[in-house]
Amino acid sequence: MLEEPEAATRTAAAVDCKDRPGFPVKRLIQARLPFKRLNLVPKEKVEEDTSPKAAVESKVPDLQLSLGTFESQCHTGSHVGLSTKLVGGQGPIDSFLRATIKPVPSVVIIDLTENCSDIPDSPEGHSELSPDTAGVVTTVEGAAKQQEHSAAELCLLETPSDITCHMEEEPGSPGDPKRTGDCQAGSLQSCPELTPGSRTCPTKELSSWSKAGDLLFIEKVPVVVLEDILATKPSIASLPMMSLDRSVTSESEILESCPEDDSILSHSSTNSSSPTSSPEGPSTPPEHRGGRSSPSTPACRVAKNFVKGSTEKGRSKLHRDREQQREEKEKLREEIRRAKEEARKKKEEEKELKEKERREKREKDEKEKAEKQRLKEEKRKERQEALEAKLEEKRKKEEEKRLREEEKRLREEEKRIKAEKAEITRFFQKPKTPQAPKTLAGSCGKFAPFEIKEHMVLAPRCRAALDQDLCDQLDQLLQQQSVASTFLSDLKSRLPLRSGPTRVCGHDTDIMNRDVVIVESSKVDGVSERKKFGRMKLLQFSENHRPAYWGTWNKKTAIIRPRNPWAQDKDLLDYEVDSDDEWEEEEPGESLSHSEGDEDDDVGEDEDEDDGFFVPHGYLSEDEGVTEECADPENHKVHQKLKAKEWDELLAKGKRFRVLQPVHVGCVWASEAANCTSSDLKLLQQFTACLLDVASPDEPEPGASRREKRDQHILAQLLPLLHGNVNGSKVIIHEFQEQCRRGLLTLPSPTPHLQMPNLEDAVAVPSKARLKRLISENSAYEKRPNFRMCWYVHPEVLKSFGQECLPVPCQWTYITTMPSAPREDSGSASTEGPGQSTPMLLKRKPAATMCITQFMKKRRYDGQVGSGDMDGFQADTEEDEEDDTDCMIIDVPDVGSDVSEAPIPAPTLCK
């Protein structure tokens, strides 16, 4: 805070600040910061001030300007040079300590503690300062006039603020100045004018100034204008000594206002561009403001000690004021912080209360919602349980009903099956043999009577039967016994008696041979005991085509054992012969219903001719030996119905059946041939054995067996027919067998590795299974670029037989009927060989006739092609299944007629 002696206001004597040493003529410009500086004194304190100085200031509002406001109103351009050179090695402080006061330029004093928020509207309002000190006597009226004069010189649009000098005076102490501590609450102050030569902003520089709100800018740079308050030049002649002393005291207080910034002042004084007038002088009258300059006043001498004491006093007072302001500021901050904290706490409490209410409400809603959901879920579960109970009860009822219906259906099915079986087997039922009367054993002492069953024999009471001779011998020995030897020692020296087995050795031959009827009794004395028959055995394999074997097998081997089951007993079995290949499937017989038109012819025939209807003993059909459960139930039902129908037809014809009794004849031994009856000999002579001369067997060649030779011979004859043939395997096999039966096949040119087998093998017709196996192993049914789908023999097979040049398609002359079109080209014209164009005589069966075997398997329609026809050997799978369902009727020429002249019979296939 800057203070001024009170004498300055009373006598209106101005103090010439240029005579004061230590303050160079400098001008500082401080950049305006974007934030507003804090006001150290609250506004309430200024408003509550009731001192007379405040009253005077209230009357003159133009004088109520703080030092910061005054400093901010003094602007200068940045281009003005502010530095001052040293003269004679002396600085501005050296001139301050001189005894003689010399006139110096205006000094810039920066008060950083004041509020610099107020910015003057124009820097030219204070450009002039009158040197005349007599105008200081002018009071508030002069200051008002000065402000009116300065208002006319504004460069900006707004009215400039009043410039005041914070110099106050207390009436009670004329020599003791006192500070107020607040720049905004100052007393009545003089308002000097700036000299014309010390203008801070010339007229030509007004274009660079701009204002935005309360801020002043120079070329977009915010500035704070600081003005020297000690730059006035009062006259020493009109200024009393007391005023000078007070002025010096005021100067010391001014220096104390910024003790911390001494270094800044000294450093910044060299950077000042232009001096600025200070408001420390008296007011000049209006008539001296025309740019006139007054002469300088003589300087006054000031004691050095007096200045030093005043400086220390001002520093202490300034320090106290700052401490007081700091405390007040801290208190104010604490109150504000406390108020904010209370407001924040109150707000948080309200927020917590609202949050708590909201949370309670939400929890309550959630509980109500959960309760409703629980009740709803319970109701849903109850409904679900009730529905499930109803469904379960309904399901149980339906299950019970279904079980009852199933049981009823099974009972009806069993009854029906039993009835059908009884209907079929009632003709084969054996007469019931009368059961032997039960034999009851008599009383056996302690045992109760019991039944003696068929295979039981009552044991005798005494097994050892003693003869009378043995009894007499025992009596003699008892009489002749001596005392020297005891009976016990004699018993020990003898051997015990031995007896035969206690079990019954003999079997009841009558039970075993009850079905055997001996036509004529013959003597069998001297004949050894026959070997007992073993149990019946079933030998059936799934991969074989021949029927299963059902009979006895009494041969025993010493080589094949459980520990070596894969051993080969070549003495007992022939491993080179495959019985499955030798099996010949018989042609299906004619249906029994075909003889309906011949009933009249068969009436007079003997009934014994029907004996051939029965299957020979030991023969089983293909499906025999398999349990009924494995068969198809639908086919089984149809089969049973057809059999019952056929039996009804046979019974309607009047045919009678009787159970055949086996006849047991022989053996007739050579020694007893004379005693044998003629009927037995006549019967046995039909089966007389013929002895044949067997040629010595050829030594087997190493590397090839008889079966392989036979296959090679058949394959050599089959290749011309097979290679390039478009027909199925059934047609090829049938044609080849027919050629073999007629003896039309001849062996091609002999190869070095192939020799002619035995005559029997060459004449025999190969079986269908063997031919099919040879076809599948040595050829493939496929399509090649050179021709369409047909059979192609493997090249290595053709090369081994030397027949690589066989044509495709084959040029075979058929002797059997051919299908109308190939299998893969049903719409194209059939390619027939030379022998296929011969007309055949066909004999059709009646339309109403049906084979009994067609119901055993699923029927395949004519022309149906399987899915595997286009892929190798699977092309004729349907033909294999049709083997058992086809029957063929052939017209056989009369015996004795020439076969070559008679027309070839045409077989008729019936499905």
Curated annotation (Swiss-Prot):
GO terms for molecular function: chromo shadow domain binding; identical protein binding. Residues 578-589, 597-612, 876-886 have a biased composition (Acidic residues). GO terms for cellular component: CAF-1 complex; chromatin; nucleus. It is found in: Nucleus. Residues 265-281 have a biased composition (Low complexity). Belongs to the CHAF1A family. This is Chromatin assembly factor 1 subunit A. It comes from Mus musculus.
